[in-house]
């Protein structure tokens, strides 16, 4: 009997290893290089300093007017598998530098978008949406660091937020900013933690999001940013590092383990 349980346990571990390799995705960019697995769109580029520059910078090192840039991990990420939904965790560090910190626009977003989707409208739409009205076909969820309105927004399929929290980006202009975003599919909980590393000020916001209803089975994950329409409202958007991991709840493994024990 004992040997049978040991054999079953060994089989379980083999199956678990295979299942995890099939349902987990992870990557880490401590800095960025031109040969990284990234899709760059618009004005996005990798700087000589190893930073991901989303919006354009002129020869005078000042931000370009009405610039748009997007960068997504090149491999699609599976979010849904039948009735199973992945949880994910992402950490990144960015710096937004405004020419005039009191009136800059528009901000930076972390987004889950349809695979192979092109850039959308500029300005307040941040390159990820096209309208102020609901777009069911947009199939996009975004966490927006909205410098125009000094807040963190959660957007689903159009630019108007369904949840937001004040966060004074203008006041902490140019600071290195650490962000963690987590999604727990077991309770549909999306959370954002933001930390301005110099001033030690923190912002956080959370909401219930049924991700399986809002995005496609496979998505692209990454960033999009836009800069203001006039020189006084321009800003740069640089991502310094980025890591991401996602994992499905392994229902089959739980069933097998309960039967063994």
From Swiss-Prot:
Q: Which SUPFAM superfamilies match?
A: Concanavalin A-like lectins/glucanases
What Pfam families does its record include? Lectin_legB
Report the domain of life of the source organism. Eukaryota
Name the keywords, alphabetized: Disulfide bond, Glycoprotein, Lectin, Plant defense, Seed storage protein, Signal, Storage protein, Toxin
Glycosylated positions are 43, 91, 100
Example of a GO biological process term: defense response
Which Gene3D superfamilies does this entry report, sorted A to Z?
A: 2.60.120.200
One molecular function GO term is: nutrient reservoir activity
The record places propeptide residues at: 255-261
Cleaved signal peptide residues: 1-21
Write out the function statement from the record: Seed storage. This carbohydrate-binding lectin has toxic effects on bean bruchid pests.
Q: Which protein, by its recorded name, is this?
A: Arcelin-5A
- What is the source species? Phaseolus vulgaris (Kidney bean)
Q: Which gene encodes it?
A: ARC5A
């Amino acid at each position: 009997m004992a040997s049978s349980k040991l054999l079953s346990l060994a089989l379980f571990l083999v199956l678990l290893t295979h299942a995890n390799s099939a349902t987990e995705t992870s990557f880490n960019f401590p800095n960025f290089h031109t040969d990284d697995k990234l899709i760059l769109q618009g004005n996005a580029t990798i700087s000589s300093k190893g930073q991901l520059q989303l919006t354009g910078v002129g020869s005078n090192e000042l931000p370009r007017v009405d610039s748009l840039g997007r960068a997504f991990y090149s491999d699609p990420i599976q979010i849904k598998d039948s009735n199973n939904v992945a949880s994910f965790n992402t950490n990144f560090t960015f710096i937004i530098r405004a020419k005039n910190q009191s009136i800059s626009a528009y901000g930076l977003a972390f987004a889950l978008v349809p695979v192979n989707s092109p850039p959308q409208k500029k300005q307040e739409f941040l390159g990820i949406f096209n309208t102020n009205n609901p777009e069911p076909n947009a199939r996009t969820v975004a966490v927006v660091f909205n410098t125009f309105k000094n807040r963190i927004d959660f957007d689903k399929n159009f630019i108007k937020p369904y949840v937001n929290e004040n966060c004074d980006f203008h006041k902490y202009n140019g600071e290195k900013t650490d962000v963690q975003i987590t999604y727990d599919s077991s309770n549909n909980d999306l959370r954002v933690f933001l930390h301005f590393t110099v001033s030690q000020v923190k912002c956080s916001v959370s909401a219930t999001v049924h991700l399986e209803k809002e995005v496609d089975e496979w998505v692209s994950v990454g960033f999009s940013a836009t800069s203001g329409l006039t020189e006084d409202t321009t800003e740069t958007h640089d991502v310094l590092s980025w890591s991401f991991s996602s994992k499905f709840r392994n229902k089959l493994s739980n069933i097998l383990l309960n039967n063994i024990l």
